[in-house]
Amino acid sequence: MTIQITIIKIEGYGPWTLKLGSDREAQLQIFQASFYSDLQNLFTKRNCILYFNRFDELIAISNGLSIDDHLFIEQEINDMYKGIEISMAIGTGETPLDANIAAHNSRKNNILVSKSKLVYASEQIQLMYNNSTKSPMDMFAQVFHIDIDNSTKVSNMLSPYEITARIMEMFSKIIEMFIEQKSMTFFLGGDNFMVISNTVSKEKVSEIINKIQDSQNIKLNCGIGRAATGRKAVQAATEALDTIRSLRDKGILQPVYEIEWH
């Protein structure tokens, strides 16, 4: 079973920002928010999900998103935002990190798809979609939705900025521990994190969560979602997290819960 990852990058972003002059920071913040919103909308309409890596680079779980779909999104964004171009590198692998590396290598080795100067994919991926109009059957995504258990208690003890400092410290720890499992972690804002984690078992995530809790002295919950596409896996993970909260309200403590959608 494999996962497909797409790396989306704004080309020439640094030089482009300099053209806006020294009073550009507010303009850039507005642009980044608008760009993310439009790109997320284009991907989620196709059952994918998008995460910030850097503000000029984003990463999507793109299971089943064909080469033609990528080309359509590229054209839509280029039409919306005159003066900038985006590139997309597509990769597959047994783990999210492997798929990410495959995507990176397709770009590094300049393996362009036909009809585009900025969409990259291995010959294997191009053949996979050229020979079928259906989504590949062996793709799936597993996502962990992690949050702080009863974060209101923490917010009552610390100021907002101090809370952010603690959360960033925790984010660093979560990234470190999950990249060892060839998984990819993203901060969603608030006290929420998501981990793309195809090959990590429920037992292993419980072990990792316990280690993080012991080092940070904060309780965590983790909803596990599995589905064929990124968007559905995220929905399942969030439903699992909601179930943990519902069980907690009934006096049942189950910090890790999993839901799989077929």
Task: Mark where each language-model region is.
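Regulatory and interdomain segments flanking nucleotide-handling catalytic cores
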Residues: M1-H262
